[in-house]
From Swiss-Prot:
Its cofactor is Fe cation. Fe cation binds at H349, E355, H385. It comes from Rhizobium meliloti (strain 1021). CDD domains: cupin_HGO_N. This is Homogentisate 1,2-dioxygenase. It comes from the Bacteria. Its EC number is 1.13.11.5.
Amino acid sequence: MLEKAEKQRRAGSGQQRAAGYMPGFGNDFETESLPGALPQGQNSPQKCNYGLYAEQLSGSPFTAPRGTNERSWLYRIRPSVRHTGRFRRVDYPHWKTAPHVGEHSLALGQLRWSPLPAPSEALDFLQGIRTMTTAGDALTQAGMAAHAYAFNADMVDDYFFNADGELLIVPETGAIQVFTELGRMDVEPSEICLIPRGMMFKVTRLGEEKVWRGYICENYGAKFTLPDRGPIGANCLANPRDFKTPVAAYEDKETPCRVQVKWCGSFHMVEIGHSPLDVVAWHGNYAPYKYDLKTFSPVGAILFDHPDPSIFTVLTAPSGEEGTANVDFVIFPPRWLVAEHTFRPPWYHRNIMSEFMGLIYGRYDAKEEGFVPGGMSLHNMMLAHGPDFSGFEKASNGELKPVKLDNTMAFMFETRFPQQLTTFAAELDTLQDDYMDCWSGLERKFDGTPGIK
């Protein structure tokens, strides 16, 4: 179905690209959609082939260490200065930026929501974004925002880039095509994609759904990278070869288009007469990518006890403090549970980090009821959380034979900063007022006498 939709979209669209993706994480890639469009041996020829313009897109300061220095050279039909003009302010009232504290009366506590409802009117990807929490300060490039999205229309002649941070998109319902300056990515539920800070893109729908829904982590800080494996060694977790960067693709059309920008928390728009997705060739290491979460190779306890959830980290955005993330992206994928004489679900916990969770499909082992695909939960710093009553009883009394935890994919955006709730999130109809009742059955068992109770 996706292949058919893709062919229909490409027919007569003026879009050009080679087939496929390039594997690897942080590689220095090179790709061209027309033969000879990519200069060899230098970055900025006096005149580029095909009459293209050479332009550098920098994702780090020029003097950043080699290991964190990011830039790509783009060879495009027009330079980006032609994709701008006199901007005017526009409003996306449901997209908030840190620092932001919503004006609401909702008391502090552990929170959970059912999925966003399907939109009752036509909304494209940008119009469908709803900020749930913000953390840190975008102006100092620290922190993040957690968004949910639900949309039902394509960005046809609308284009967008975010100067405030990179966007990690996690589809839950409905596959999407993310067409960036550097190429196109088809992203299905159970896959993620990342769009670097400042990179132009648009989002269209793939397949046939009533709603396209998912989650976004807007990372204001240092870019996401792979976590160090430490004693785990050279393999497992997210392997670099499973990350896919798109090959060059461009859109050559002369039609009224709108370029929209998020800059320091405000939104701006300019009208131009052509598509800005006009990069015919490029090389460099500042690039978008997608990743299939099903290729994550989990590690865990193979004798007793439950390890820390950091072993499930897919990507981490470091802060200035060693071992402390600005934001981590963590998943809880299918895996075998084999620990002996052990309470196998995640333990009860209070944490210096703040956790925003979502469920892509299946059930989450610590919350088998109430936490459904498309739903969300928020456990802020130092607020207690853990398995619900039924999960505790099941895990405490079940036979400890090897069990495969299958058909599940939950995730977490975890940050060192407290996550401030937006007014939208506090007043959302899908907020579960009875969430904390899930622990009400956890009664006192202690009676002062020895023995298992």
